[in-house]
């Protein structure tokens, strides 16, 4: 029988291969000729170099050049991180990439020599089409306008054809005038990370060059930083950072929908007037007129800013002389009436019933006014001195001393030329233990008619009016006992005062003619008082040759004067507030919380209006940055910081036991604990307070226990870590 079983496939293939090989001679013939070369392929895309912009911690923008041809502007710019590494990947198709371009030109106002920036690409802001704001070319509206060169350099071509462009506000592009291109970027990622940057480029399109450009540089942003900080000046959600970008947008053509000018000069003057901005209404009645503009959520009134500088009308606070400012003196040489109305409103109180005729400006009548002279009395007072001599302790344990006020020529100032009105008394404040934060506020006895103690009421004596002083031929003879509101206050002088540091601090004003350095009687019409800036008298009575110990460095006085200028809120002679506002000074009512608050210098510095406008910071100061006010000096082992903890053991700081309670008891905190509580008391949890107490801090009703506390805060909370906790670095 025939076997019909199928053989495996591999056996069949092997058999076929064997037959094929048997038919080969072993020679495969000559190699064929080489084929013709193939057609070269297209070049590949260049690779990127640098860092993708979405991976960057920060971005620095710089416009490297611009050109104009046929009505179109082409812009070259770079993006890099702070190390100079190029940032590629900017794209109008990326929803996180909010990137904008604006244009403005510098031109003279019609009928005026005043040169002003006028924005282009303007948009209307009301239905009538009569008010305008600066418009932008947004990258997301024209992604194809951008070329990314892959290395952090970019080219952007404006889509607007300026040769036939009709601006909504009627501004006519002139290629022969100075133009400003500005960049605004603000990337806000879902992670919370943000990139924000500005850049600008001034040039003349007709020549495609920067030679011969016009300027309008009146102030520097660094001057603003004297009071403000960079983060507090980030406008419009952090998009606007540079002065040049502010100028481009807040220019001579823009206003809110109601026609209120938001031109930079007008706006800045008006905002800083705050609640002091007043004018006349239609009936001729003086009324508050805080600067009010229509915003995204309705009208916004700037009735809260507190301009801290004295004298108030000292223009040089902002218009600081700076050789790098091309137009630093323009504000005097060519005053802008729009800036005038920023302070004085369109209906100045000083005008009364007078109405400015059509076509006239402020400078037509007031062109010769020199506001720089408003500081003349203060400048003069800086040259005055207060001499203290014949300091003695009486058998009754009172201190007596003589005081003479001298001008810069050594001439005595008379009693009639020394100012006294309201809270302004010509005080001599007596203190001891200066290096230990001044005397504690204690009342030894009070029988209703006489009180003996060391409170600031017991330690300050007026040269006029409280019975402590006798004036004789230019010299005031002072005894440390006075009468106030019918009660006699006697200072309790320490028995060992001869070996303690003694300070007698003069806090007084001298009267001058208005806007003048000429001294005058304080009853004269328009007499202007200015504080004498003179060092306090310090000594050790038992050893007048000894070196008098100083209070540790805490605050940088220069920063205080930089913002406040010649005068603080009151009683101003240097940064000596603690002479009265000691750590344990009595509490007072607090309208903000409805309860009580501390009145110590530390608390006031941390929480004063303008220093603190809410938890976590303020609109003026970045309060979380301790270096805003505190000192930093070179020490043996590096920098010594004025906010370092652990330097002031033995003190008791008065605080309310509970925030918001008008009947709260006075409790006391140890020094480092008080520093934290001056800002954070309202927000301290039980766990946080337990942590403080667990590390030696004290907060309770017993003053002696606060003084005896042995705090260990500084062990962990170094200045570097304190700054880190608040989001900053040293």
Labelled PLM ranges:
Residues 33-52, 349-380:
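A eukaryote-biased signal for short, well-structured alpha-helical docking elements
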Residues 346-369, 381-388, 396-413, 707-710, ...:
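Repeat-solenoid scaffold signature
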Residues 57, 68-320, 398-664:
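Extended surface/linker regions that mediate inter-domain or inter-protein docking
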Residues 234-237, 256-259, 325-330, 350-355, ...:
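Short Cys/His-rich "knuckle" micro-motifs
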Residues 11, 15-56:
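Collagen/collagen-like triple-helix sequence repeat recognition
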């Amino acid at each position: 029988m025939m076997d019909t079983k199928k053989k495996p496939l591999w056996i069949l293939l092997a058999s076929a291969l064997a037959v094929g090989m048997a038919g080969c001679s072993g020679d495969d013939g000559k190699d064929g000729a080489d084929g013709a070369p193939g057609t070269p392929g297209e070049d590949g895309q260049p690779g990127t170099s640098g860092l993708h912009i979405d991976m960057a911690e920060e971005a620095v923008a710089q416009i490297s050049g611009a050109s104009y041809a046929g009505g179109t502007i082409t812009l070259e710019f770079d993006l890099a991180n702070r190390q100079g590494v190029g940032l590629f990947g900017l794209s109008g198709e990326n929803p996180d990439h909010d990137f904008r371009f604006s244009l403005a030109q510098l031109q003279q106002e019609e009928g005026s020599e005043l040169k002003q920036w006028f924005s282009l690409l303007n948009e209307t802001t009301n239905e009538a089409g009569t008010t305008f704001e600066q418009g932008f070319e947004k990258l997301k509206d024209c992604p194809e306008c951008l070329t990314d060169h892959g290395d952090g350099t970019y080219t952007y071509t404006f889509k607007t054809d300026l040769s036939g462009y009709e601006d909504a506000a009627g501004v006519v592009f002139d290629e022969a005038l100075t133009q400003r291109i500005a960049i605004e970027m603000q990337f806000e990622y879902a992670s919370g990370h943000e990139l924000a940057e500005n850049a600008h480029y001034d040039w003349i399109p007709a020549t495609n060059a920067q030679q011969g450009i016009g300027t309008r540089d009146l102030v520097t942003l660094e001057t603003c930083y004297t009071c403000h900080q960079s983060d507090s000046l980030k406008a419009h959600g952090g998009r606007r950072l540079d002065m040049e970008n502010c100028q481009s947008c807040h220019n001579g053509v823009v206003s809110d929908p109601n026609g209120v000018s938001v031109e930079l000069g007008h706006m800045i003057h008006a905002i800083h007037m705050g609640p002091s901005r007043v004018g006349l209404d239609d009936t001729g009645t003086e009324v508050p007129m805080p600067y009010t503009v229509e915003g995204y959520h309705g009208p916004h009134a700037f009735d809260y800013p507190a301009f801290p500088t004295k004298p108030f009308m000292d223009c040089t606070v902002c218009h600081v002389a700076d050789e790098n400012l091309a137009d630093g003196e323009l504000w005097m040489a060519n005053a802008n009436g729009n800036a005038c109305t920023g302070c004085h409103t369109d209906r100045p109180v000083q005008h009364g019933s007078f109405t400015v005729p059509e076509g006239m400006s402020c400078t037509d009548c007031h062109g010769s006014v020199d506001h720089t002279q408003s500081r003349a009395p203060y400048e003069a007072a800086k040259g005055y001195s207060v001499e203290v001599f014949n300091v003695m302790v009486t058998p009754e344990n009172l201190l007596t001393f003589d005081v003479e006020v001298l001008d810069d020529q050594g001439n005595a100032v008379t009693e009639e030329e020394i100012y006294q009105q309201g809270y302004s008394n010509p005080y001599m404040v007596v203190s001891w233990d200066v290096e230990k934060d001044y005397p504690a506020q204690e009342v030894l006895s009070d029988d209703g008619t006489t009180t003996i103690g060391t409170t600031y009421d017991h330690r300050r004596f007026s040269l006029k009016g409280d019975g402590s002083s006798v004036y004789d031929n230019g010299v005031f003879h002072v005894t440390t006992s006075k009468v106030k509101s019918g009660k006699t206050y006697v200072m309790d002088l320490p028995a060992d005062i001869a070996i303690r540091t003694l300070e007698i601090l003069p806090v007084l004003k001298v009267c001058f003619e208005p806007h003048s350095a000429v001294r005058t009687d304080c009853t004269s019409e328009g007499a202007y008082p200015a504080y004498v800036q003179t060092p306090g008298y310090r000594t050790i009575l038992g050893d007048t040759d000894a070196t008098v110990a100083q209070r540790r460095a805490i605050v940088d006085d220069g920063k205080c004067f930089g913002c406040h200028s010649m005068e603080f809120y009151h009683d101003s002679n240097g940064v000596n507030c603690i002479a009265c506002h000691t750590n344990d000074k009595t509490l007072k009512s607090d309208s903000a919380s409805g309860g009580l608050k501390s009145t110590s210098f530390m608390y006031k510095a941390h929480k004063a209006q303008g220093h603190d406008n809410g938890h976590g910071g303020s609109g003026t100061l970045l309060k979380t940055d301790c270096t805003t006010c505190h000192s930093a000096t070179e020490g043996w082992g590096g920098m010594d910081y004025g906010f370092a903890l652990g330097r002031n053991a033995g003190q008791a700081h008065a605080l309310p036991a509970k925030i918001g309670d008008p009947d709260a008891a006075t409790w006391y905190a140890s020094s480092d604990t008080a520093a934290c509580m001056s800002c954070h008391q309202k927000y301290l949890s039980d766990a946080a307070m337990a942590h403080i107490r667990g590390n030696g801090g004290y907060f309770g009703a017993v003053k002696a226990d606060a003084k005896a506390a042995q705090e260990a805060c500084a062990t962990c909370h170094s200045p570097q870590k304190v700054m880190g906790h608040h989001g900053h670095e040293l």
